[in-house]
Amino acid sequence: MKDPYDVVKRHYVTEKAKMLEGLSLGDGEGKKKGSFCKDPKYIFIVAGDATKPMIAEAIEAIYSAKGVKVKKVNTMCVKPQPTRIFRGRRKGRTAGFKKAIVTFVDGHSIG
């Protein structure tokens, strides 16, 4: 097996990712427990050649101190997006990447 930190690069933090984490745990006002998803979901940036079993093993190895168990892994590749810099003169592309939505067993979290 590869080093877990070569498979999972970093935790992906966006508004949508935080919503997936927060709504599943039912914390905060105005949020109903289980209104969006039953189990906690976290999003990670992973290596392009990583498979779902590799990602699950790496997450469990990285967070072994917290004793998390992975229930399900969904992956998707985000395509590079065109960009323009300085009034459209310099054109380029953002980097594409692969992300994984990891669902933990109910009652487990990394937060």
From Swiss-Prot:
Function: One of the early assembly proteins it binds 23S rRNA. One of the proteins that surrounds the polypeptide exit tunnel on the outside of the ribosome. Forms the main docking site for trigger factor binding to the ribosome.
HAMAP family referenced in this protein's UniProt entry, alphabetically: Ribosomal_uL23_B
Family: Belongs to the universal ribosomal protein uL23 family.
Cytoplasm in keyword set: no
Gene Ontology terms, MF aspect: rRNA binding; structural constituent of ribosome
Keywords, in A-Z order: Ribonucleoprotein, Ribosomal protein, RNA-binding, rRNA-binding
Disulfide bonds: none
TM helices/strands, residue ranges: none
GO cellular component annotations of the record: ribonucleoprotein complex; ribosome
Protein name: Large ribosomal subunit protein uL23
InterPro entries reported in the protein's UniProt record: Nucleotide-bd_a/b_plait_sf (IPR012677), Ribosomal_uL23-like (IPR013025), Ribosomal_uL23/eL15/eS24_sf (IPR012678)
GO BP terms in the entry: translation
SUBUNIT field: Part of the 50S ribosomal subunit. Contacts protein L29, and trigger factor when it is bound to the ribosome.
SUPFAM superfamilies noted in UniProt: Ribosomal proteins S24e, L23 and L15e
